[in-house]
């Protein structure tokens, strides 16, 4: 089980890694939990010769294709997406361009730029309410609704690249798929109701801050629409 990493999501990854490690051991498998902080820890895998690397890493290095590429180089099978897919999807802007090309519904967006004006962005994105998030980060770190020009100006002083989108209001639904014996199977549909203004870092990782409803209540027609 590979966890930790070098990103701002390191703490979350370590907690998730510990939980996965304990679950895998309960299932009767022999497992090792490795805190990834660089290539030296990855080299340990040549000694362990694992049947599988279970990835619980987040953010830079862990989800951006670099770790996946190193595991490919070491011929170590791993969970999750390929190095190429990980690299693409870590960049929200590039991922959205691919989604649009493939005909998948996704909101319009703008990259934050020096001197950006909130009212101009509202006109460009045809929305009175805008939301900003990091271009490459995760766990909703730094994400917020842009209510004033000061909110936007604050982001100009940070080193991150930012993505600005219309604020989408609706139910928070998660639907996962798993491939078993060559066939894709959908997992139960989950609905999340955060106590905060949106499903932010605190709501995601603080016990009691989010209500999880499984399965999510919905019509069969809606369920089939989501699955398809």
Language model segments and positions:
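Glycine-enriched alpha-helix->loop->beta-strand junction motifs that scaffold or abut catalytic
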Residues: 75-77, 126, 182-183
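Active-site nucleotide/adenylate-binding loops and adjacent lid/helix of ATP-dependent enzymes
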Residues: 1-3, 45, 88-171
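Conserved anionic group-binding/transfer micro-motifs
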Residues: 13, 225-226
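Conserved beta-strand segments of alpha/beta enzyme cores
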Residues: 30-32, 77, 105-108, 185
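ATP-binding N-terminal substructure of ATP-dependent carboxylate-amine bond-forming enzymes
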Residues: 1-84, 88-90, 94, 113-120
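Phosphate-binding site of ATP-dependent enzymes
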Residues: 147-225
């Amino acid at each position: 089980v590979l966890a930790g990493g070098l990103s701002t999501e390191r703490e979350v990854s370590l907690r998730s890694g510990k939980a996965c490690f304990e679950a895998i051991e309960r299932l009767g498998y022999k497992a090792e939990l490795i805190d990834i902080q660089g290539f030296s820890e990855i080299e340990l895998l040549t000694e362990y010769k694992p049947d599988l690397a279970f990835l619980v890493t987040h953010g830079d290095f862990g989800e951006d294709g670099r770790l996946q590429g190193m595991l490919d180089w070491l011929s170590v099978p791993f969970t999750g997406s390929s190095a190429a897919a990980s690299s693409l999807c870590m960049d929200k802007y590039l991922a959205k361009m691919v989604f649009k090309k493939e005909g998948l519904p996704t909101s319009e967006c703008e990259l934050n730029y020096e001197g950006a004006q909130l009212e101009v962005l509202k006109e460009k994105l045809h929305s009175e309410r805008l939301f900003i998030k990091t271009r490459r980060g995760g766990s909703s770190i730094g994400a917020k609704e842009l209510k004033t020009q000061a909110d936007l100006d604050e982001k100009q002083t940070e080193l991150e690249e930012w993505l600005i989108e219309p604020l989408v209001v609706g139910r928070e639904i998660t639907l996962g798929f798993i491939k078993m014996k060559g066939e894709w199977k959908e997992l139960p549909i989950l609905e999340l109701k955060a106590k905060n203004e949106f499903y932010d870092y605190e709501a995601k990782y603080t016990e009691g801050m989010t209500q999880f409803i499984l399965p999510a209540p919905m019509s069969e027609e809606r369920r089939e629409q989501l699955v398809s």
